[in-house]
Amino acid sequence: MPLTLSHQQTDGDAVIALDGELDLASAPDLAELAGELVRNGAGNIIVDAQRLSFCDSSGLRILVSIANDLRPVGGRVSIVNPQPVVLRVLELTGLDRTVMIDWDPPQAG
């Protein structure tokens, strides 16, 4: 299933909603969008993973890269509402200790 990205940005926060599979084919799209949002002033990026059905190592690498890009400006990446299969991957790889995992509805601003 291809990945669909949507986003909104308010003040210092941006929400990126992911729908589908984050994998080798789609990870560059997320990287490009996140890079654009950071260049446009996003200090924090909230990834709405409610509809993310799969994430492979390419997707994980992009999430770590986004977190590293935000660190110098004091920002962070939060992943909200991950599906159990995605949460398990985050836990197995230790990424749940690098990014914040939350269960609240995402809001920019």
Task: Mark where each language-model region is.
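STAS-like cytosolic regulatory interaction modules
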Residues: 1-54, 64-109
